[in-house]
């Protein structure tokens, strides 16, 4: 009898409200307060297996904390999900994006993200989209306990992925602990592979809106009236056959 991979859905997105037992907003403790990565004007809808969020105009910004300035509106799964010690574990979601008032082809103005995060090591494995781009992020966050942070944006223009505003993309981030590798895919096509990776034992999934303009001269440069609309569905994990 042939084994079948085990697929687990994190949230069926039944609605009508977002399930607060499954999701929480990313928070950063600052000297004067706890910063919640949530756009107060966000229009959120949960129904028919989909989460949709629309922010007509970003408002969140920070003058010196780069991570806080980046994360405009970011939800994290309440529980971590383990990575199987052998075989290939794939974390996946379908995402769609429509940029609102953004500079064409400039992902820094804001993108829809599917995040696969390891907060123990600061490692980030994301698949992201705007109206006109789809790309991978490979990153080590500049957390207090992390050395040598980096951020790489990987655009693979020859993959042949059809890109259009509001189009659904099937995204995957796969880990193979034995091979020490990670792979990012969209619609079954490989965006990027990384090797000699410290594969996490468990990850936190996230969904949200992120900008990537550098903070400089004591102020944020991430706001110029732009916004973003996005959607997520089928957020979950597929474990290897046992």
What residue ranges belong to the model's regions?
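Extracellular carbohydrate-recognition regions
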Residues: 1-38
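Ligand-recognition surfaces built from glycine- and aromatic
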Residues: 3-16, 55-63, 85-106, 144-147, ...
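Short tryptophan-centered beta-strand motifs in secreted/extracellular beta-sheet-rich domains
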Residues: 13, 167-175, 182-184
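Secretory/extracellular carbohydrate-interaction modules
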Residues: 27, 32-146
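Short beta-strand micro-motifs enriched in acidic
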Residues: 128-130, 174-178
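Short, aromatic/His-centered strand-loop micro-motif at the edge of beta-sheets
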Residues: 144-174
């Amino acid at each position: 009898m042939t084994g079948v991979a085990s697929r687990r859905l994190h949230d069926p997105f039944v609605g009508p409200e977002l399930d607060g037992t499954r999701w929480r907003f990313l928070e950063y403790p600052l000297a004067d307060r706890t910063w919640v990565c949530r756009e107060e004007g966000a229009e959120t809808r949960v129904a028919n297996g989909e989460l949709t969020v629309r922010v007509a105009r970003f408002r969140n910004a920070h003058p010196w904390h780069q991570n806080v300035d980046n994360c405009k509106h970011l939800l994290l799964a309440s529980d971590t999900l383990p990575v199987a010690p052998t075989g290939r574990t794939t974390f996946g979601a379908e995402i769609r994006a429509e940029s609102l008032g953004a500079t064409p082809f400039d992902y820094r103005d804001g993108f829809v993200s599917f995040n696969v995060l390891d907060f123990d090591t600061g490692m980030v494995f994301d698949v992201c989209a705007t109206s006109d781009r789809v790309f991978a992020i490979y990153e080590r966050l500049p957390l207090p306990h992390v050395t040598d942070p980096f951020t790489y944006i990987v655009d693979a223009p020859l993959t042949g992925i059809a890109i259009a505003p509001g189009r659904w993309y099937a995204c995957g981030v796969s880990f193979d602990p034995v091979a020490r590798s990670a792979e990012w895919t969209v619609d079954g096509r490989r965006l990027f592979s990384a090797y000699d990776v410290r594969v996490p034992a468990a990850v936190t999934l996230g969904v949200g809106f992120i900008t990537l303009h550098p903070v400089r001269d004591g102020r944020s440069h991430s706001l110029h009236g732009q916004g973003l609309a996005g959607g997520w569905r089928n957020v979950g994990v597929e474990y290897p056959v046992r």
